[in-house]
Regions:
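Disulfide-bonded cysteine-rich modules in secreted/extracellular proteins
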Residues: 2, 6-9, 61-73
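Amphipathic alpha-helical interaction surfaces
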Residues: 12-20, 36-39, 54-62, 72-76
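Short, charged early-sequence alpha-helical segments and their helix-coil boundaries
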Residues: 37-65, 96-113
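Amphipathic alpha-helical binding modules
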Residues: 69-113
């Protein structure tokens, strides 16, 4: 799994968790995170993806460690407290979703980072 794929999965998870929210800060965070607004690899607000990449660093991302990395990433987001979305995630459910996403055609599949 590359870092863009994990970023996309985090975005999907948060979008689903907060789909009915009226919290403007969460809505804005999700809007800025949107990895599908532009054709390139990144987010709607490039600074969000840059911060995420800085957090990832040289870390190797696997399906098995991706949930822990995702939990760590949402903890460093200063703009909106979105950590609750990852408090009670079933590890098997997360991994199943990752594998399903990775097995289908998706943006960023050919990104080596």
């Amino acid at each position: 799994m590359n870092r863009f794929e994990l970023f996309s999965l985090i975005y999907f998870w948060l979008s689903r968790f907060y789909k009915n929210t009226t919290d403007d800060r969460v809505i804005n965070q999700l809007s800025e995170m949107n990895p599908f607004l532009w054709d390139d690899i990144g987010s709607a607000d490039p600074a969000v993806y840059d911060d995420y990449c800085a957090f990832i660093g040289d870390r190797k991302i696997t399906v098995e460690n991706s949930l822990d990395i995702a939990k760590g990433y949402v903890q460093i987001i200063d703009y909106a407290d979105i950590t609750e979305a990852f408090l009670n995630v079933d590890h098997e459910q997360w991994e199943k979703g990752c594998r399903e996403y990775l097995s289908a055609d998706h943006k960023g599949a050919d990104d080596s980072k």
